Amino acid sequence: MILFDTHAHLDTARFGDRTERRLAAFRAAAAGISEILIPAVEPDTWDDLLAAVADLRENAPCVRFHTALGIHPQALAELDPARDQAALAALAARIEARPAGVVAIGECGLDFGPAGAGASRERQVAVLRAHLELARATGLPLLLHCLKAHAVLLELLAERPVPPSILHSYSGSAELVPAFCRGGHAISFAGAITLPHARKPRLAARAVPADRLLLETDAPDQTPASRRPARNEPAFLVDIARAVALARDEPVEAIAEVTTANARRLLRLAA
């Protein structure tokens, strides 16, 4: 069984130093994870992210590593609004230079929950619009964070087409799944679907067409239920695959096969 973790923050300080990141990669490979996508969060850590990915590519070749650059909506609270345009211009320059391993734009999006309250909704929308324009200009997919803002995100995506993108750690309803999929986008599920009373993500997982289904850990956050209180890591993606398989009443091997193929197709990666 081969799995693709489409969202894991292996570069975060919670994974310690380079040695600990490499060990996490080896554990992931032993669990059947063949590829991991590590997204950016804030401009000040882009260089460290690219260095971490380069190190993993060189020293943990048991897993194929990819990355993305963007500005997370929660990171806006720490960014002076006067710097927004400069940060977005720097992002565009980085993306156009296409550093090794960069296959997407993000993590970016909208967070209208408490964690995103440090930036106004208007500011979040403006920053996301810039990411959407960059995706249109480059043809790269987006890694979209969306919390309590699905209707607004749908409106933005409907204004002008963007390349097929990923709804990361989907928290919306099953009823909204068709609207996102009509735009060509994929829906990714994380550890929340493993929780005992997680009815909403299970219903959503059933509603996603097979060719739009993805898996992720969102490590180090969202540890699957059976692994708590441990820090989450890509090796635990197996638990999420099993939970999605159970929700859809399908063999876990079939879920692994289709989600890995979907990720490679959307990110335009060779098998």
What feature does the model see in each segment?
Residues 1-271:
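Mid-domain alpha/beta scaffold segments of enzyme catalytic cores
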